Amino acid sequence: MAGRPHPYDGNSSDPENWDRKLHSRPRKLYKHSSTSSRIAKGGVDHTKMSLHGASGGHERSRDRRRSSDRSRDSSHERTESQLTPCIRNVTSPTRQHHVEREKDHSSSRPSSPRPQKASPNGSISSAGNSSRNSSQSSSDGSCKTAGEMVFVYENAKEGARNIRTSERVTLIVDNTRFVVDPSIFTAQPNTMLGRMFGSGREHNFTRPNEKGEYEVAEGIGSTVFRAILDYYKTGIIRCPDGISIPELREACDYLCISFEYSTIKCRDLSALMHELSNDGARRQFEFYLEEMILPLMVASAQSGERECHIVVLTDDDVVDWDEEYPPQMGEEYSQIIYSTKLYRFFKYIENRDVAKSVLKERGLKKIRLGIEGYPTYKEKVKKRPGGRPEVIYNYVQRPFIRMSWEKEEGKSRHVDFQCVKSKSITNLAAAAADIPQDQLVVMHPTPQVDELDILPIHPPSGNSDLDPDAQNPML
């Protein structure tokens, strides 16, 4: 190693002085290497240093830079304003808290100006820490294979250091644990989670299990719940990929979160607009029901009817029927609403489905909604010789609603009449007169044995084919 002089040492900070020493005292270069001179200034003898020990200075400076970078990154992550969930594998909140303390302590140790101790074999003492960290990471890897996944949600204002373990709650949703700071729910007190962990937490009807964990949001997937937790921090729910809007809507309704355009953000605008249209159609039809439809239903009920047939016409439609020749399809029993807005509302099939669901919720029966032809005015009259004249009306396609509030519509009158048995009614023969003659023959019952006993005995009138034993059934 010291067989020939080196013109320049990369570890030296003053190359001119080194050249001067090289020309003035050339013999010392053959006695001491550059590495031994550097170590002699530090006061440590490394004459028997191995190759690993010789490169320890470079590794030590590199480790210092990495540890300082890690400490800066960790402090930057703790003060980050965005609430990003991090995935950790822990067995309990207490163990997780101890692991975080050990990590903070280990990250702050290399950044101290105190020099590290060298082992007799030339290795640095931080190698033991790295081996412990590697063993810990291997144990964490085994936890990952076990399938226990924890999402930690913290409040960005307080920071991770100010949150104690007792101030966190663990929510179990779809076999996934979410470690959440309950203070994030106070921003939305009208939601289900805001009521559970808000000011009235002592009156909460949901109790934790034996491990102190809360099982909430039954039937909601972990991916959907993770997106909903972002709502308590940012006020916006971003629909994850692969999750349908109806599924997200059902989860929002379960957790009492308003489903509005300012709350939901997704790529499928068609599905989002469809859900928003359903909400708007429900509110609009409830208004139409109270203002336009219900008065006509009351008028039908006051006249003794138990059903109502309503036709929706536009404001420009004109109904002009001939009093002498009215339509012959029963349209005279229909109620009419002149409203172009309601006509446009029922033009869409989705709106008719929403209206039908609202009427079912209000207790009505036999609900039919659709579009049918309705006669407006008389076009011409065809007169037939010796018969009734035929009237031709102009028909327009308009929406209609038919509903009933009859309570006994499920009973069959035909079955009730068949079950009646009475011998005191004498007009049954008159009622049976409407039955065809061929059915009367089939309906006559055959004589029974006990009826033959009371029948009068008549002498045989030349009927030789009759069996004599049949005259006396007792024989």
Swiss-Prot record:
GO terms for cellular component: cytoplasm; fibrillar center; nucleoplasm. Residues 81-94 have a biased composition (Polar residues). The keyword Cytoplasm applies. Ubiquitously expressed. Highly expressed in adult brain, testis, aorta and small intestine and weakly expressed in the heart, lung, liver, kidney, pancreas, spleen, thymus, prostate, ovary and colon. Down-regulated in glioma. Disulfide bonds: none annotated. Residues 1-143, 455-475 are annotated as: Disordered. It is found in: Nucleus; Cytoplasm. Pfam families: BTB_3. This is BTB/POZ domain-containing protein 10.
